[in-house]
Amino acid sequence: MHRQAHHRSGLDRINQAAYRRAGVLRQYETASGWLEPGEQAAVMLAAKDVRGAPVLDIGIGGGRTVPLMRAISDDFCGIDYSPAMVAVARRRFPDVDIRTMDARDLAFPNRRFALATFSYNGIDSVDMPGRLLILAEVRRVLRRRGRFVFSALHRGSMVNLPHWPDWEVFHDAGLQPGRLFRATARLLAGGINHLRGLGLVRDDGDVAVASLSAHNFALLAIFMSLATQIRELHEAGFAVEAIFAPDGQRIPPDDPADDGAPWHHFVARKVEARRGYC
């Protein structure tokens, strides 16, 4: 085991603040089941080789994935870097091993787990140096040929994303004063959230940082092209076994056409150890 130093970037501060908000916590507390067919397909593909073996669930939020992962193995540990989220998950699952921990600095020995998962595009919520630390740490704690299943936002979908100002907030308001007031307040709050992260927004073509309409533009995230994501995994010591679109359609890793899907689910395998790797 080793400890790594990392600083909190502006993106970190914005996102961690969002994850402490009561409204966000309530949404995560009630989430359950598979998000979509693509998520289920990716996890089930990896699960075939790791049932009963140790599982690490990163970024568990309010605990949505806990029953899903424990159906694969009782040797389970869930982590999240948000103490508020961990408190929610522990209330829901008091007998489960759930810890406050940052994926950039995993407090586990080398080769501890057979499977690591990171759902909800959580890997996109840290900056690029942090993202590479996560991949290195996940690889370190995985066993030989261990699997890493995660979802990541797709650069090719950004043209279809809602942007602030999002006038859709007035769609159901009609002419009712109360609804109009709430819609206006939401629009203005979204504008404040958007401006808070505006200095971090960028677009380098294959990689971009943008605000998400989720939680009223309170979150910033990285968007990456499929080819860039695959290259990043290869350079981090993983082989890409499968990619799934949200609807469950499988995308060939060796010919990754940039479709318009908002995100993809990846199944990556830890490659054979090389000098300098665990």
Regions found by a protein language model. Name each.
Residues 1-61, 64, 261:
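Conserved class I S-adenosyl-L-methionine
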Residues 104-116:
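A short acidic, Gly/Pro-enriched loop at the edge of an enzyme's catalytic core
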Residues 115-129:
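A short SAM/SAH-binding and catalytic strip from SAM-dependent methyltransferases
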Residues 151, 155-232:
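SAM-dependent methyltransferase
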Residues 132-144:
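A short glycine-rich, Lys/Arg-flanked "PGG" loop and its adjoining helix->strand segment in the class I
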Residues 253-278:
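Core SAM-dependent methyltransferase catalytic element
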Residues 62-105:
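Class I SAM-dependent methyltransferase SAM/SAH-binding core
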